[in-house]
Amino acid sequence: MIKLVLLRHGESQWNRENRFTGWHDIDLTDQGRIEASNAGKLLRAEGFTFDIAYTSVLKRAIRTLWHVLDEMDLMWLPVTKSWRLNERHYGALQGLNKAETAQKYGEEQVLVWRRSYDTPPPALEKSDARYPGSQARYASLSEAEVPLTECLKDTVARFLPLWHETIAPEIRKGRNVIIAAHGNSIRALVKYLDNVSEDDIVGINIPTGIPLVYELDDDLKPIRSYYLGDQDALKKAQEAVAKQGKA
């Protein structure tokens, strides 16, 4: 049986401040580092091991993976970093407080921006300091590949080439894979693997620092999926994510 592990990064500073983060490269809090280390300890205790790891080019995911691999004594593991695993780009909302944005635009509108499948937030201007196109880490991307905003549909389209061309072939070779990424890039893969409808994806919330395990058949179709660890703590963490966009 094939097991794939997905892990959203530990709590970041902007998670704590309840801000839209997107492609902004904010670091983990002390709590986020603890969450990441605990995830590594839990994976080791449950008998997991890995042959290759994937993460984004944002430090909160990279550092989370470091902590996990350190706890598992797998720091030597090959790691592929890809912009395709970045968080969804939140456009002009990046940096804004979610509750304050809900007060201004209404909770319903913010829910649409945060969780709907095909409605992006207002776009950035290319002249905006938050536009990622001028950053060295994205120098190899075409102008069309650098987003000004994204909906989840855009994130799925961005991520799937990496899945089909790189990650899935490694899994088919029998390699054990961990992906340390972000709430919406993981939601993108969950939607694809589980064939979640556009309506139902609104209700899927990925908590920070809790490993999500997929058991897959030989065609990489899910047999089942489950989170490791305390299930009461998981439920509270998912509820906390869902409440972030309330006024």
Swiss-Prot record:
Catalytic residues in the record: 9, 87
Q: So, what pathway does this thing act in?
A: Carbohydrate degradation; glycolysis; pyruvate from D-glyceraldehyde 3-phosphate: step 3/5
List, alphabetically, the PROSITE patterns matched: PG_MUTASE
Which Gene Ontology terms cover its molecular function? phosphoglycerate mutase activity
Q: Return one Gene Ontology term, BP aspect.
A: glycolytic process
NCBIfam families assigned: pgm_1, PRK14115.1
Protein task: Catalyzes the interconversion of 2-phosphoglycerate and 3-phosphoglycerate.
Q: What protein name applies here? A: 2,3-bisphosphoglycerate-dependent phosphoglycerate mutase
Q: From what organism does this protein derive?
A: Chlorobium chlorochromatii (strain CaD3)
